Amino acid sequence: QSTPAFYFVDAVRLPSGYTTPAKADPLGTRVQRVEPLGATPQADHSAHPPFDVNAIRRDFPILRERVNGKPLVWFDNAATTHKPQSVIDRISYFYEHENSNIHRAAHELAARATDAYEGARERVKKFINAPDVNEVIFVRGTTEAINLVAKSWGGQHIGAGDEIIVSNLEHHANIVPWQQLAAAKGAKIRVIPVDDSGQVLLDEYKKLLNDRTKIVSVTQVSNALGTVVPVKQIVELAHRAGAKALVDGAQSISHMRVDVQDIGADFFVFSGHKVFGPTGIGVVWGKREVLEDMPPWQGGGNMIADVTFEKTVYQPIPNKFEAGTGNIADAVGLGAAIDYVNRVGIENIARYEHELLVYGMAQLRTIPGVRLIGTADDKASVMSFVLAGYTTEEVGQALNDEGIAVRTGHHCAQPILRRFGVETTVRPSLAFYNTFEEIDRLIAVVRRLASVRRVG
């Protein structure tokens, strides 16, 4: 089993008193922490220069907001991330100096806009280590990305009696499009179960694979629990069974290094707004030979090479899948967000966020009445919980009163919450601009509620 991408040889910097024992990876190239999240870690504080979270925070203007008279604490990063000033400025610059439609004019602004748009595509290609820039398709977000694959690839390759595998962890966006396809084609959805920690059961997954399996579509990180899924193994097993594989990277793209060639999936999808970029822009990456075999799922301008009343000849990829005027400015903004993440360093981000997660989970475990939902050893970002005596909405409101933003509800992932016997959770979710002090503010509120917990 490969080591999760957010584990590193280097030790981490933690609050005073925390240290992290580690065990060598079998390959000898990485170190994987052996304690479950929340156990006392060991750290060599000299291993890294300090991660200057205060410098990072100055780059995000919205973090200077006050809510109910208190400094904003943004713990709703699994829903959306905030934007650094450089992204805001880049979008403004586009509208001030480059605004034009792309690809279809000889004038200067069209050339500028096209260069900016295609430059963003190149940035995405490098960020996810795609082999070919033309394999990067811009869409509105992860939801549209999965729908594109389900409608185009699925519509062509799924038939009656075929099977589609998803995991119990999936966001509704990675369930409903496949259900719609299965209903239309007479296919069947199979579900990979999870254990009591929220990690997928690979042995049970292997039992689901057969010659009727056509595609396996799984998240890399659960939006509801934070579980990091062993997607590389899942993809390898799917391919051995002759199936295609899609990985939903909406919740992984901002937390760990993504290498689509290493993962090996046929499709990888994500949203810009989950990686400090704008809303309304996302990515489908697909293997060239798979994309070239797929029909376009929308028709219109930009995706055509020639149109007569008798037939249409389509552009090659990626334009074949980008009908009409795309979200040019926000694609450029996504490119700027990737530049920002690259400057900070995704390894630095992953390391620091893991410190926060270990600390936050440990603190929540000390509060009477708190039940953590999702305790897999391999986690990223998310700390879902319920508090005895309170609805999740009541906890969320109490936190909001103190300026702390968390998501409460089912998080568009009802099946996995019901697996744990709950309908909703409180979901603080972390990003690299959060601090230990902010976690302490959250813990203080939850501890206060627990101290006056209602019974019955």
Task: State where each predicted segment sits.
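Pyridoxal 5′-phosphate
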Residues: 1-456
